């Protein structure tokens, strides 16, 4: 999501995904909207566009995880409300199953994940895990997240 915000286009992202899969790598495909797009109620449209273009003609879907990473949330400490996050994750999974033929889509949350919000994020029922960014660079914070997730 951050790369898109800095100008990396969908065609380049699609080539990177294709190349990674051809080399038997797992892919975490990040999608997300900016704060302006969110305010304009464009989240679904933006996510569909990113999925359609970024995964265009991709075959090995079982090696892809999707990370919903709202650009407006990354590193800010701001997190979508649980019900909003649940709604977006459900929307992504339904689209992946029905339109992109994913058998069992896995969706991670990759906005601001921290020791302070991990307990709330864990309550989002259809979330399959987390893509931890800044907090993973601090061992104490990262261990705290792990403990609160698994213990």
Where are the regions that the model predicts?
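Active-site loop-to-helix "anion-binding N-cap" substructures in soluble metabolic enzymes
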Residues: 1-151
